[in-house]
Structure formats: C-alpha cells, structure tokens
Amino acid sequence: VKIESNEGKPQHEQLITVKLPPEADYLNDETLEVYEQDKKKYDQTEQLITNDSITLLIGDYGYYDPVQDAIECSAVIVNGTKTEIKDLSFQVSIENNVMQGRVFLDNSVPELTKEQTGNFKPSMGIPVILGFPEEKPTDEIENGRKIDTKNIKINLSDIQYKVVEQEGK
C-alpha cells in the first residue's frame, strides 16, 4: 500500500495503545528512557489519528546534536489502518520553528523491521527517534541543546507498508 501524503486527509479521535518494540531489550538506557517517556505520554490516550493511514505523534524528546549536525526528536508512529501492517517505510520532513535560519533536510525512514515494530496492529503506536540532518552545518554550535518539541511540526509523505495476511482468511 502506498500513500503519497496525509495532507488534508480526514482524522478521527481514537484510543491508542503504545507498546515498546521487541528491540527494546537491546537498546541503550538513554533511548529506552525516551521510549518510556513517550509511551507514558500517549499510551491509553485519545489522539487525533489520520483515517486509514499512519500518524506521527511528536514526543517530548528534542535535541540538536552538534556531532551529527542534526535535530533529533522522538515520536510515536500510530497504525491508523484497520489491519496489521509490516515493512513500513516513509519520508519525514520537519518544519523548523526552533532554530531560525537553519535548514534541516528531509529524511527517509527505511523499512522498519519486525524487531522495531513487533506485530503492528491497528490503533497501536510504537516509539521511534527521528533525525534531520542540517543542510549547511556551520559548526558554530559546539554544545548540544534541548529543543522544545512543541515547536516542531513533522510531515509524513511517501508512506508504504504491506498488509499482514491473517491466518485462515
């Protein structure tokens, strides 16, 4: 299934369940802490979900990494379709209202593995950390800085996934 964009698509309020991915067992403590925070923020909450598509809910972790020259932010990917899905991939672009005068490039999220999503069922969310490299890094920022994720807007495009066939259908 391929979806160009969620722009202007209808949305509905929906109760979502956030699960940590199977790979959580192997993640470093910092990443796990970010995932746990976002799980706590969104698990068992009503959220505005795009009909029959994937929705990205922005988490609380935002950081400018001077080593990578990139903004990192956490998010929860929600399956707003009516079926279990796999092999999800998409493009993300960031609207930078945080660091004026700097341009951050779009990024591709390659096919997420079963280790990253588990069984990705409808109304389920999984935490991720997204990165957006800076177009022309200047190296003038030496120290990392926290970013208020309320000022970040992320757009999804080129969403692709496969429907998991149910046994016995």
Task: Report the location of each language-model feature.
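Short, acidic/polar linear motifs in exposed loop/turn regions
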Residues: 79-83, 98
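Membrane engagement elements in two modes
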Residues: 1-72, 84-86, 126, 132-169
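Amphipathic protein-protein interaction modules
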Residues: 89-93, 116-119
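Short, hydrophobic/aromatic beta-strand segments
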Residues: 83-91, 103-106
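Intrinsically disordered, low-complexity Pro/Gly/Ser/Thr-rich segments with frequent PxxP/GP/PP motifs
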Residues: 104-144
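Short edge-strand/loop segments of extracellular domains
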Residues: 93-97, 155-158
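Short, well-ordered beta-strand segments enriched in hydrophobic/aromatic residues
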Residues: 71-79
